[in-house]
Swiss-Prot record:
Catalysis performed (reactions): Endonucleolytic cleavage at a junction such as a reciprocal single-stranded crossover between two homologous DNA duplexes (Holliday junction)
Cofactors: Mg(2+)
Organism whose genome encodes this protein: Acinetobacter baumannii (strain ATCC 17978 / DSM 105126 / CIP 53.77 / LMG 1025 / NCDC KC755 / 5377)
GO cellular component, one term: cytoplasm
Record's subunit section: Homodimer which binds Holliday junction (HJ) DNA. The HJ becomes 2-fold symmetrical on binding to RuvC with unstacked arms; it has a different conformation from HJ DNA in complex with RuvA. In the full resolvosome a probable DNA-RuvA(4)-RuvB(12)-RuvC(2) complex forms which resolves the HJ.
One example GO MF annotation: magnesium ion binding
Similarity field: Belongs to the RuvC family.
Example GO BP: DNA recombination
Protein name in UniProt: Crossover junction endodeoxyribonuclease RuvC
Record SUPFAM superfamilies: Ribonuclease H-like
Subcellular location: Cytoplasm
Top-rank EC class of the record's enzyme: hydrolase
Xref: InterPro entries: RNaseH-like_sf, RNaseH_sf, X-over_junc_endoDNase_Mg_BS, X-over_junc_endoDNase_RuvC
Amino acid sequence: MPLIIGIDPGSRLTGYGIIEKDGSKLRFVDAGTIRTETQEMPERLKRIFAGVERIVKFHGPTEAAVEQVFMAQNPDSALKLGQARGAAIAALVNLDLQVAEYTARQIKQSVVGYGAADKEQVQMMVMRLLNLTIKPQADAADALAAAICHAHASGSMSKLTVLNALGGMARGRSRSSSRRR
């Protein structure tokens, strides 16, 4: 059964989420954040790299999904986000994982059925799809959503499974949910 790690990169908080995929079923394994908010940028990147590496070595995922950088209005923020993303990807690749990349819109479309969903909607759908009783922290939920998106994109999850998990929330959006990659 594939074990998928999702990464939501950030220069202060990098979210990670690990799920197990068994056919059309998903199981929560672990989620959290790598905190780097008090260090200078080189130390932050080191901490992201080491944190991702430690998590991968502990859990042994077989697949990885990382959220792509969006172009922020602030070029400095976009640069820092790109550096954090690079540190996370380098750690994954250093441990021989292939990395799938998805835009935030693709992830939201796959998980919520709506590419412009807000963070609260993503958190609620992650809870529903993984049968969680406690709402994950936003960065961890985004990382879990990236892993779920990858599970859907890898072809082992059927559209029907996702729509069943959505329940009443899928009404009116089922056609758009089929356009995920």
